[in-house]
């Protein structure tokens, strides 16, 4: 099981004045060790079957969200695919302040540019497809007929508010405000997806951490907490 030491190292006081509080170097090493040619070939094979593995990030400089097709990258970018996907995975986990932004090289109409990308949660906690996408029309075009549509939304967090005493200091109040914002954004994202797809006959199922799950992590990647959470979900 992955713990804190497998994901980051603390930068100590110097991190306050730098890009982030933590260095995700261990996570980069772990991702690169897992993204073997064999795994990338398996991901690429799913692209040929019409399946998509999507990752969302945000360009922190332009404030524009990007959705990356990892399956296509695995299938069509040759020797650079491991590096590109590693960077995108790190960027998708780069919570500003905690982890540094990741520099991603992209092809623009006016040439190649380096962009700074961070966690896509800044734009949306959950995403599915561009607004207004007509799924039935899409399926008729690619499969010859509309099919039964089921969408499963999984949220690694609680959706309901939690009654909790908050210490009256800047850090505690800021953390509480961010937690409240994330929950509100998650509910709005899920409601928006559900309402937009209901008109097309799509059945939407949702799952989140139960309200009665009372355990609290001692750190960002508390192994004992993650095991208990897994048992609850399983």
Where are the language model's segments positioned?
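Patatin-like phospholipase
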Residues: 1-234
